[in-house]
Every structure is written in C-alpha cells, then in structure tokens.
C-alpha cells in the first residue's frame, strides 16, 4: 500500500519553462554569455543549476565561479512570478494529504524554501529534499532516498511523480514506484 507520494517540482507542480529560461538567460547575460540554446532550454527545466552552469562553463572555473557569484545576490521574485501553477494546486495537495504523506524531491536548490511559500504549500509537505541538501542530483536516487528517510517510509510504500527521464531513473534507482506526467 502506498503511504508516501513524492513530487518533482518543475513540470509537475507547475510549468516553469518560461521562468527557468529567463533565470538562466539573465545570469548568462550578467557574465557575458549568450542565451540558452534549444537543447540547454530542455535541460534547464530538469537538471540542477549546478549541472547547467557546469555544462555552460565547459571546465572554465572562473566562468563557473562568476555564474555562482551572480546567483548569490540575485532577486528570485521576478522568476517566481513567471511560474504557472494550476489554481487548484493547494486544495488538491491538501486533499491528498488527508490520505498520504507528501514530499517534495527536486533538483532545485537555494530557491526551494521560497518556492514552497510562493506556491502556498507551506506546511503541506511532510518531507522536502533537494540539491540544497548537498546530495547528488537526480538521476541519482539520493534526493528520493533522503525524502524517504525524512518521511520514515520504506521505498516499496512510496511513489514518485515526475515528468522526465531523470525522474524515472531516480525512482527506479531508489526502488520507488513512478508516475510519469506531462
């Protein structure tokens, strides 16, 4: 029997394509880099920021450091306003919470606490794990395993709702059921 429903964030709880593309393009402009190309735009929604930055820097430590420096002092609010959550997200999550424990397992990092509040989901999740926890990002199973540990639920009694290949791979590696959306 399923006891825990874990959710990815981007592409599952909300549409973040416009927000993520604008976020990375803003950072890249600040460090003199061109905007994301089409392939990078796809990765910008699913991959951790550290992976997107590392791929763009191509081994250039100074460029990578400059990207991280820009993010330390930037205002996230304009990018949060571009997120497209369904109007019924909070009521849906509260209804689900009556029957299951809920968790958020995402490759996002520093934006997670503010994102949860922005979406009106404060107090909804029984466990949250992200790249902010200093674990390997998905497709590694670490983020999902950390959610399981924090929720106190065995993998066989959990399901992960995701929208990408890396979500499916993380779920399989963590030994949890998977529901693909999008």
Describe each PLM feature range.
Residues 36-40, 123-127, 155-159:
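Short acidic capping loops at alpha-helix termini that bridge into adjacent secondary structure
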Residues 19, 48, 110-111, 165-166:
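Short alpha-helical
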Residues 78-84, 107, 180-182:
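Short, flexible loop segments at the rims of nucleotide/cofactor-binding pockets, characterized by
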Residues 1-98, 122:
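N-terminal helical cap/lid subdomain that shapes the substrate entry/recognition surface
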Residues 159-182:
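Acidic, Mg2+-coordinating phosphoryl-transfer loop and its flanking beta/alpha structural elements
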Residues 22, 29-31, 51-59, 82, ...:
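Substrate-recognition/cap helix-loop segment adjacent to the acidic, metal-dependent catalytic center
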Residues 6, 13, 104-105, 160:
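Conserved SAM-binding loop
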């Amino acid at each position: 029997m399923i006891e825990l429903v874990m959710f990815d964030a981007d592409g599952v709880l909300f549409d973040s394509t416009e927000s993520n593309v604008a976020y990375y393009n803003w950072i890249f402009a600040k460090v003199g880099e061109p905007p994301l190309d089409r392939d990078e735009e796809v990765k910008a929604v699913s991959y951790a920021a550290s992976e997107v930055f590392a791929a763009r820097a191509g081994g250039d430590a100074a460029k990578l450091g400059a990207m991280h420096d820009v993010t330390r002092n930037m205002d996230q609010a304009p990018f949060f306003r571009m997120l497209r959550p369904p109007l019924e997200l909070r009521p849906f999550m509260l209804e689900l919470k009556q029957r299951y424990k809920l968790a958020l397992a995402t490759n996002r990092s520093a934006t997670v606490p503010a994102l949860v509040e922005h979406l009106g989901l404060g107090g909804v999740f029984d466990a949250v794990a992200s790249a902010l926890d200093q674990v390997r990002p998905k497709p590694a199973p670490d983020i999902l395993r950390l959610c399981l540990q924090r929720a106190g639920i065995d993998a066989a009694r959990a399901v992960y709702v995701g929208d990408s290949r890396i979500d499916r791979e993380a779920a399989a590696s963590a030994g949890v059921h998977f529901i693909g959306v999008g």
